[in-house]
Amino acid sequence: MAAAVLSGSSAGSAAGVPGGTGGLSAVNSGPRLRLLLLESVSGLLQPRTGSAVAPVHPPNRSAPHLPGLMCLLRLHGSVGGAQNLSALGALVSLSNARLSSIKTRFEGLCLLSLLVGESPTELFQQHCVSWLRSIQQVLQTQDPPATMELAVAVLRDLLRYAAQLPALFRDISMNHLPGLLTSLLGLRPECEQSALEGMKACMTYFPRACGSLKGKLASFFLSRVDALSPQLQQLACECYSRLPSLGAGFSQGLKHTESWEQELHSLLASLHTLLGALYEGAETAPVQNEGPGVEMLLSSEDGDAHVLLRLRQRFSGLARCLGLMLSSEFGAPVSVPVQEILDFICRTLSVSSKNISLHGDGPLRLLLLPSIHLEALDLLSALILACGSRLLRFGILISRLLPQVLNSWSIGRDSLSPGQERPYSTVRTKVYAGLELWVQVCGASAGMLQGGASGEALLTHLLSDISPPADALKLRSPRGSPDGSLQTGKPSAPKKLKLDVAEAMAPPSHRKGDSNANSDVCAAALKGLSRTILMCGPLIKEETHRRLHDLVLPLVMGVQQGEVLGSSPYTSSRCRRELYCLLLALLLAPSPRCPPPLACALQAFSLGQREDSLEVSSFCSEALVTCAALTHPRVPPLQPMGPTCPTPAPVPPPEAPSPFRAPPFHPPGPMPSVGSMPSAGPMPSAGPMPSAGPVPSTRLGPPTTANHLGLSVSGLVSVPPRLLPGPENHRSGSNEDPILAPSGTPPPTIPPDETFGGRVPRPAFVHYDKEEASDVEISLESDSDDSVVIVPEGLPPLPPPPPSGATPPPIAPTGPPTASPPVPAKEEPEELPAAPGPLPPPPPPPPPVPGPVTLPPPQLVPEGTPGGVGPPALEEDLTVININSSDEEEEEEEEGEEEEEEEEEEEEDFEEEEEDEEEYFEEEEEEEEEFEEEFEEEEGELEEEEEEEDEEEEEELEEVEELEFGTAGGEVEEGGPPPPTLPPALPPPESPPKVQPEPEPEPGLLLEVEEPGAEEEHGADTAPTLAPEALPSQGEVEREEGSPAAGPPPQELVEEEPSAPPTLLEEETEDGGDRVQPPPETPAEEEMETETEAEALQEKEQDDTAAMLADFIDCPPDDEKPPPPTEPDS
């Protein structure tokens, strides 16, 4: 045919190829080639002039080849262009000439189809109206249906391009479209399908101009809705669904919206009436239509013997119209009455075959029931597509509806032999398609297979349709014993076996059957199940996953070995592909408690690559790539460097601190007794453990780059060096894991006053611009109830009180922890290091425990679910969903609702936090007042004790002076030098070899924070004693850790800070030196007096120091019990 196209016009001068016989080899450009092709087609269609030789291809012979010629011409690309205008002009003239003749009208339409699609814009605008008139003339003739079909196809393209040009759009709308619709309505019955195609094109591209004929069009469509031809019925339904958009609408399409809703309610009312007529008496509790719709006036044929068939066909057409109205696009936002549509669907699907009588026309009604259910399921799918995830409030109804339909159509499915199609497979396929669509739209929120009776029923049906049929061999008993028991009685002679022809059965290998039987329902069930597992897998129960593993893995191996094939649905490549897809879904979305079958899946996919079907083998290759990415990732995963001790349970990732997020709850582990506390080894703990007296610190701490959660800080955030935990500011509390002490050293004892009675110390805020001795500013604005102890350098720490029982559990703070660095050790300006030592982040908040002071933190309610009850209800009607609205309107509405909900939640959270803080601060103020009263009483007692001790010392000194000066005064004056004054940092002289002096730290300040209320919790007998001590600097701690066995350096004298207030230690020392200058006379008296005076001096110094510190920070000292001997602090 191509040779005929190129050689048919060799005689014409315009069609000749320049360059002689070079042919296409002489053509250098594509446009030139298309021009030659156009001229060749023109030469084929028109006779040669000026020649007596007859044409090689007469026009009547070239007409059958013309559609093929047009298609071949389109293969070469667009024929439009400035260089082809002359050839296109020749084709336009030729097309108009052919359209005017009845015999050549089909050829003219073929040329016109090429010109409409390939002509440039200028040529199209010039000839569009004339072409439209020519087509209208063709529609008014009595041409054959093939010519009418081609004319309507050209009309559709003509209207599509004309709607893009405003001038042509206005001209055709006002002057030509009503006449065109009238011509289409007047076509004869055998051309009804072409007429519907033309009307659909007019309503699609020119909806406003069709408004004048809306009534006539509606009647025409309704008369064809119940047509017996499926194509004609589908076209009529599509045209009827476009009726609400016809005509001119007001602003924002209000009139169109009202028309759409009116048509929808009319369809619902008519469908309810038809369903009642079809199954009158078969419904247990029929739902009456209460909508505003008016029933349609459908044509009725009197004397029709098949009334039920006509009603069924009409029901099918109106249900399709309703589904198309829901699923097709509409120009204005509309409201869908979801509850009314679901009521109709449930009413239709509740008609069961068990309730239909088998007398009269009952069998015919039963015969029609599966098709009625199919239409209802199609309508449900259209509703899901139209409303999407906004149907979640009806999710329970939908999840119950699907297994109900499967139960009603599972009768007699197990009694058939393999190779036969099971009954009602089409209905079950439609149910599984709806399941897949519902899960695809709503995801894990669909709630499918997540427990309940409906989920178990659905899973049972899915597994039954997926499992291949098994060949059942029925063993028949001997003829003499119907029950199969052996015959007893007198033995008889053996008889010869006779061949029973009636019992001769064909072997199972030679059986008539369909190899693709049940493949559709099996593929649909596999597809729906794999989609459900992929979207809802982690939420499905572990038992369901195990059941699927037990079914799928042997089935895959049987398919690969050829054992399952034969008469099973897995002979179809589509079912095998969906089976592999289900296996991949089980691998990608496993249950948290059931490991995925990774090794078996890898083997199965590897063997699946050898499948004969390219579709199956290519899917297995893709699945292997996915599995390889899971098992061997190209980038190593981020594994946090946690502590060396194993964690007993997986810990969720830490969340950023937020004032609206409650701290994670960790249940407190059991508190072991002090005696049974392990001294070494890992001790996993689920939460902070309250301390009971001095707990030996056996902590194997995380590295210096780990935070308090055991995660690597460098992998999370870049923390400045000052905030990194270091040994000089990180104290192991009772809520931390134990570590081993340095080599050979006993575990140091942490007094409970350092842990503040077992509580986690609250951070104190220290603000400084430069680390200098004179620039320390202490700010306690956020923790006004805390107390701070500043201990001068060199002062020995007060010994801890003996442990007396377990302390009460720690109380959770009412608010979120505030991140603030602790106070670093104060250093001299000349020894200030270039990089300050790292500091630890604030400790995590302890878990909330039940107690009188514990306040529940505010919880953040997720958006869209107030109170966690369910999805938000609509303001006006819960059963109406707006669809087809613009994205901007929906986003503005959703943003407005979300902002209002967030503001309400934030106000509630802030109100709760303010109430909690007010209650907390009121309690703290009461405790402070009680402490002030106790402090005043203790201060008075301290002053009285000091006066009594001063009087006793003066009396003792007077007695000593009288004794000394009375007996040997001159010897004393001429004797040796006076005894040296004991410095305050030295231990008592009673046992100098037992007590080792502490290493002298650099000058610094120690901040210890104690929450008031600890004394009330401990009671009067176990009140915590403040143990002030000086923190060592970083360098000294490193030296101590590096050489723990090394001896302590010699103590240095305490230097007075220029910015610190003058202490009373030096004055007391000087007074003590003046008073104890004379040496004793006798050794016994001397020793007794020295011991007495040393003890009194030490007690007084400690009491004075405590009083001075209490005056400085208004913190009452605890002097109710005499302090035990000083112990060395590690």
Curated annotation (Swiss-Prot):
Biased composition (Low complexity): 672-684
Extent of motif LXXLL motif 6: 264-268
Motif extent (LXXLL motif 7): 271-275
Biased composition (Acidic residues): 774-786, 886-964, 1083-1104
Pfam families, per the entry: PELP1_HEAT, RIX1
Motif LXXLL motif 10 location, chain numbering: 579-583
Subcellular localization, as worded in the UniProt entry: Nucleus, Nucleolus; Nucleus, Nucleoplasm; Nucleus; Cytoplasm
Residues making up the signal peptide according to the UniProt record: none
InterPro entries to which the protein is assigned, alphabetical: ARM-like, ARM-type_fold, PELP1_middle, RIX1_N
Phosphothreonine modification, residue list: T488, T745
Positions of post-translational N-acetylalanine modification: A2
GO molecular function: chromatin binding
Family matches, as SUPFAM superfamilies: ARM repeat (SSF48371)
Motif stretch (LXXLL motif 1): 33-37
Keywords: Acetylation, Activator, Cytoplasm, Nucleus, Phosphoprotein, Repeat, Repressor, Transcription, Ubl conjugation
Motif annotated as LXXLL motif 11, chain positions: 584-588
Residues spanned by motif LXXLL motif 4: 155-159
Gene Ontology cellular-component terms listed: cytoplasm; euchromatin; MLL1 complex; nucleolus; nucleus
Positions occupied by motif LXXLL motif 5: 177-181
Motif LXXLL motif 3: where in chain: 111-115
Residue numbers carrying Phosphoserine: S13, S477, S481, S1033, S1043
Function of the protein: Coactivator of estrogen receptor-mediated transcription and a corepressor of other nuclear hormone receptors and sequence-specific transcription factors. Plays a role in estrogen receptor (ER) genomic activity when present in the nuclear compartment by activating the ER target genes in a hormonal stimulation dependent manner. Can facilitate ER non-genomic signaling via SRC and PI3K interaction in the cytosol. Plays a role in E2-mediated cell cycle progression by interacting with RB1. May have important functional implications in ER/growth factor cross-talk.
Comment block on domains: The Glu-rich region mediates histones interaction. The Leu-Xaa-Xaa-Leu-Leu (LXXLL) motifs are required for the association with nuclear receptor ESR1.
Full protein name: Proline-, glutamic acid- and leucine-rich protein 1
Source organism of this protein record: Macaca mulatta (Rhesus macaque)
Encoding gene per record: PELP1
